[in-house]
């Protein structure tokens, strides 16, 4: 299913399509690997596979030339743009929620208002186990260095720009999915 949606929106932009697919495949693989280690969490792996491949579908609408994005929206809106796209495709709401709730370690209403972010004024934190898993896995891969997996320390540092309790939310996800032994 994800392939048809990507094919529809990513025509004539081979470099961006490559970035999207490579990044999304890395996120998907990590999420599925983690899910396989946690049968007790009853993670819907079929949904995770599809949703992880679509979580960044909205980058086509943002202005981020460094990663071949030549849209008009600010980059921070790629999640809500993706959610709008998936809703317009008639996908179940849970796919759209993954898109809009994976930025940072999720964004609270306070984060959005206090930082004056150009986002809807409501809580955008991941809630379901699948939303949390995809959000967590995404933090280990950037779209600028497709060949590198971040360490936990690098992932944590990349969250500093989101402020608030972002780091604490990420650590909670880490303890859920990859607890220290």
Descriptions of predicted regions:
Residues 7, 28, 32-35, 82-87, ...:
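Amphipathic alpha-helical segments within well-ordered protein domains
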Residues 40-148, 152-153:
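Divalent metal-dependent catalytic cores for phosphoryl transfer on phosphate-bearing substrates
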Residues 2-23, 58-71:
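Active-site flanking loop/helix segments enriched in acidic
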Residues 30-33, 139, 176:
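Alpha-helical scaffold segments in carbohydrate-active enzymes
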Residues 9-16, 34, 140-143:
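Alpha-helix C-capping/helix-to-loop hinge sites
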Residues 159-181:
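Charged phosphate-binding loop/patch that engages nucleotide di/tri-phosphates or the phosphate backbone
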Residues 15-43:
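N-terminal-biased segments
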């Amino acid at each position: 299913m994800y392939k048809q949606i990507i094919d529809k929106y990513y025509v004539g932009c081979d470099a961006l399509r490559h970035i999207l697919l490579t990044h999304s495949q890395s996120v998907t693989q990590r999420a599925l690997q983690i899910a396989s280690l946690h049968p007790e969490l009853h993670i819907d792996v079929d949904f995770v596979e599809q949703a992880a491949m679509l979580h960044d579908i909205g980058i086509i609408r943002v202005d981020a030339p460094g990663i071949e994005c030549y849209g008009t929206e600010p980059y921070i809106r790629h999640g809500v743009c993706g959610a709008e796209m998936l809703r317009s495709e008639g996908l179940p709401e849970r796919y759209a929620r993954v898109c809009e709730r994976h930025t940072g370690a999720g964004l609270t209403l306070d984060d959005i208002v206090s930082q004056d972010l150009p986002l809807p004024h409501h809580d955008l934190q991941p809630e379901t186990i699948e939303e949390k898993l995809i959000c967590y896995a995404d933090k280990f891969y950037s779209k600028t260095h497709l060949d590198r997996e971040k360490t936990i320390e690098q992932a944590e540092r990349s969250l500093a720009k989101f402020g608030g309790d972002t780091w604490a939310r990420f650590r909670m996800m880490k303890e859920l999915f990859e607890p220290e032994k």
